[in-house]
Amino acid sequence: MEIPAALKRAALALIAGAIFAAVPHAQTQQQGGHPGRLFPPSDLGLLDAPDRDLWQRPDQIMDALGIADASVVGDIGAGSGWFTIRLARRVGPRGLVYAEDVQKEMINAIQRRVGREGFSNVKAVLGRENDPRLPASSLDAVLMVDAYHEVEDRVTMLSNLAKALKPQGRLGIVDFRLDGTGPGPAPEERVSPDVVVSDATKAGLKLIRQEPFLQYQYFLIFGK
């Protein structure tokens, strides 16, 4: 029995629609992460796990980025302020830390923590989606720890971070490896370092080096 031409066209349209519908999903899987899905403020306590100093190695990260006394630095997606206070201690009273987050609850938590611990060299910044609202050409280093997989428009965010760096400034991105180890997000929510490098290249940044010393994470350092 011959199939009517109209029915053939309808079947082909359904097949084509299914194929095109699958493309964004495949791209999402390839890119990794769940862009726009933010860390819930109700889980802030998880960011201050007692053993985090052991596997996060904040001093080595700051050393690798050249963060020292009087440095001006940014903590992007600062969350509970765990890294913020360590940066503030490192740069001292002559330095400045911009602690940025896009969630007001996080900014409030950072301000409480900074006040409780007596730091006067931290400025909390409520960023916009894909724009941390940092002053142009003013930062020696910018650090984004365990937050890259949450960013919705990564190239735009990286472009804005690049604008905030001084000519010789450095951007450090730390996020969890794809093997699923460690205390980070589920494997399907993680982002490949190759994707980060590709995004950074599109944003006009260059990979300087990759540091291998973290137990569960990769650490990429970029410059202009």
Predicted feature descriptions by range:
Residues 27-74, 82, 112:
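Class I SAM-dependent transferase core
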Residues 88-92, 155-170:
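A short glycine-rich, Lys/Arg-flanked "PGG" loop and its adjoining helix->strand segment in the class I
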Residues 130-142:
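A short acidic, Gly/Pro-enriched loop at the edge of an enzyme's catalytic core
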Residues 10-22:
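Bacterial N-terminal signal peptides
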Residues 107, 170-197:
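Conserved class I S-adenosyl-L-methionine
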Residues 209-224:
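Core SAM-dependent methyltransferase catalytic element
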Residues 73, 142-143:
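Hydrophobic beta-strand segment of the Class I
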Residues 74-132:
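Class I SAM-dependent methyltransferase SAM/SAH-binding core
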